[in-house]
Amino acid sequence: MRRSGSAWWNTWNAYDASFSYMLPVKRGEPGQLLSSMRFHTSLLLAILLALATLQGCSLLRLGYGQLDHIAAWMADDYFDLDHQQKDEFHKRFARLHEWHRYEQLPDYAAFLRDIRGRVEKGLAREDVVWVAEGVRARYRTLARHGADDAATLLLTITPQQIEALKRQWGKDNRKFIREHKLDGTPQERQRARVKRALDQVTDWVGSLTPEQEERIAALVTAAPSIQPLRHEDRRRRQREFLALLEQRANPAEFPARLRDWLIDWEKGRAPQYQRLQPEAWENRIAFLVAVDRMLTPHQRATLTRRLQSYIDDFTRLAERRGAQTTAQ
């Protein structure tokens, strides 16, 4: 029996929309990872985001320690891997995991420390832009490092496994439509947007006052919705990935093509979506700055404590095993 990994894969929404939304994932409700199917480089980033929704530091550390098993489970859920492919996935992902843990997590901790410092002072427009650029840079580092191994694995994917992937994508797309009320009335879509924003803010800063909720709802309502275009862009990325798999006849060129596709993920957007991106991004910046300015001292302290908990987790995870034993 195949297992459902959609909840884990769905973490991609937090990254896929990070440059137009830049709000962390809601605890217990990760976003949509497979919207663009960046396979095993995005897989690592997505699981990190999913682990960040766990309650408590020890759970995050436990989840990251089992990352290779979680990743294999997720890949199998989408591709229905055979035994040989699973073994190869474990071997290659273990190398990526080792590199990421000891080379990248210290940088993530430093990045979060800088974010925490900016949050403590109060966010300005340039701070939000800086965070977005930092996320982009770290994604590209991950994509460049993992693209060759991902390409090697993708060369083994069969037509039957591609059909399994399409079926799983169909489920993901239907879930996106359902959660964002794309098949509902404009009023239903608006209510869903407001609820999602309130849930995300509350998850990071704690309870909101009625006045804050009203102000946040007004900010969301004032900004035009681009969810239908986002959905179409997800499907565009899925089509591109399938087209990329058709180019595997030349194994020597495929890794470079995959790497370019992973990094230039905005290339090929529909003209209307591309045209609206600058406005959507500016709206999101204004939203985040406005929310930051309405935070009470207690809410700001809640946010900085949560950021610090992730800093502590990443720092501890990046310690070599010998150092951890000594510290204990």
Predicted regions and their residues:
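Extended amphipathic alpha-helical interaction segments
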Residues: 150-270
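Tryptophan (W) side chains
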Residues: 8-12
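Short, structured motif recognition centered on aromatic/hydrophobic residues
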Residues: 75, 88-89, 146-157, 165, ...
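C-terminal motif of bacterial Sec signal peptides marking the signal peptidase cleavage site
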Residues: 54-56
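Bacterial signal peptide processing site
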Residues: 58-60
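Start-of-domain marker
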Residues: 65-97
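A cross-kingdom marker for long, charged
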Residues: 72-73, 231-328
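Bacterial N-terminal signal peptides that target proteins for export
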Residues: 34-44
